[in-house]
Amino acid sequence: MNLDFASVWEMISDIVPENDALICGDEIISWKDYDLQSSKIATALKNAGLGPNSKAGLYLNNSNEYLIGQNAIFKIGGVPINVNYRYVAEELIYLLDNSDSEAVFYHACYSSRIKEISGSLPNIKAWIEIADGTKSEFEDSLKFEELLDSCDPMERIHRDPNTIYMLYTGGTTGMPKGVMYKQGEFLVFLFRTLKAMGYDVPEDINNLEEQIHNFKKDNTFIKSLIGCPLMHGTGMWLGAFLPLLLGGTAVTSRNLGFDPDQMWTQVEDTRTTNIVIVGDAFAKPMLDALDRAEESGKPYDLSSVKVIISSGVMWSEEIKNGLLRHHDMMLMDTMGSTEGGMGSSVSTRDNPPKTAKFSINPGVIIIADDGEILEPGS
């Protein structure tokens, strides 16, 4: 596929410039401004000496700036590096060194840790700080807002679809490792996921521009609320990439803790169509909040919700049934890892859910401990 993330989003920004691209709390960024701000930050990265294949870390909480910074890295032909905001100094040094990062975006609340590690990372050319209401403790940084004011937007360029997209593992099976994909091939995987969810995706993805015009005419864009961190594959791939690749909206909250009532209120306020979570850890408190609201005589308005998507942790049959009792929607349970998606199951009121039962994706095989290839279900 001769496509890459930044070029797709540039095309979309030209078609629906006034539509919402990013929402975080009460801050709304249009597609026009998403492209413009990303282009200005891309200029800042180039001015710092970054270029094609340069790596840049995203040491950020969920925010519009996370997605703007990532797009800026894509625009220069670079490689964004997801950084776990829970890491301590030693882990941060390892990850940023292992990834060959040349720049780091970080929220001001992490500035003391940046100050602690900066001397151990001589290859970092730019530390870009994003204000979050906390006091900065690191002086040698570029300020995100000042860059938006001072930088001209970078001119659009042709990019290689074989440019790497990389996501680092969480480190649960050893030190974090970067899993690499060619952007063009990874986009094929993402569009297949959208097709499996029932979205009208053209057979030839290079005809995507025509499809975006159709979405515009019918006003059928996805609006996805991302309940989990963007630093992990579930939040980024299923929560942000899927809606943005079809000209939709990525909705986040700056709150670090999970508040189910705040989430359902945000669903009502933004008219969310999709919700992305991580199994029962999210779904159970979400169900409890719905039950409480119903018992109080003030149920949440779920009429806009079409699908809840989960990956990463078990999503039990009992909790799925409870959610379906409140609203008729699709529940999509996906099985995968940083290395790729392997299977999924879809539940509705007409197709009752089961716990941990999946249909494997095309191209997936099952291998026994002795190397023998097994038939699914055998």
Name the predicted role of every residue range.
Residues 30-32, 164-204:
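Conserved AMP-binding A3 loop
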Residues 246-248, 272-277, 287-353, 363-365:
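Gly/Ser/Thr-rich phosphate-binding loop
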